[in-house]
Amino acid sequence: MVADELKEVVVPPEEATFWLDRWGYWCNAHGRFQHKKIIDYFHAAIARDEKGYFVGQVNGDCREKVYFRYEDTALFVFDVLLDDRPTLVLNTRQHIPLDPDALFIHNDYLYMRQDGHLIKFNERSMLKISALFEHDGDTCLITIGGERKAIRDRDAAASSEDGERHSNP
């Protein structure tokens, strides 16, 4: 059957029985998922369309899309490949180049924006990428290929712009 001919079953986020917590763990009413194969499958099945992020699969003659809730973002950096040009390994298994100009800090966490996606570094990836960091007073710098760049602190920038602290990255 051609993919365009598949019947589509859509579950809205308010009816989904699972979600991503702010650390990138899949959860349901009983707590965090425990089975690695299921966790990996869910992460690899994340996609996005105009309605938001969903976990998708083809099951027989149906394309299933379950839009899910997430506490912070749906995309996380799970690993960093430290080469001349570092590569980020996302929870979806996608590999993307690190863009130092797209990095920012918010609430003591490192994020990167790419193509309209907000990507958060989890604790493991933060530890790994910290080998590239330097601190110069209040500024966090990242060195890639001999070039040092300042990482924006979104909280400080927002605070200096309008006197308010913003909670959403």
How would you describe each model-predicted region?
Residues 1-169:
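Terminal leader/tail segments of proteins
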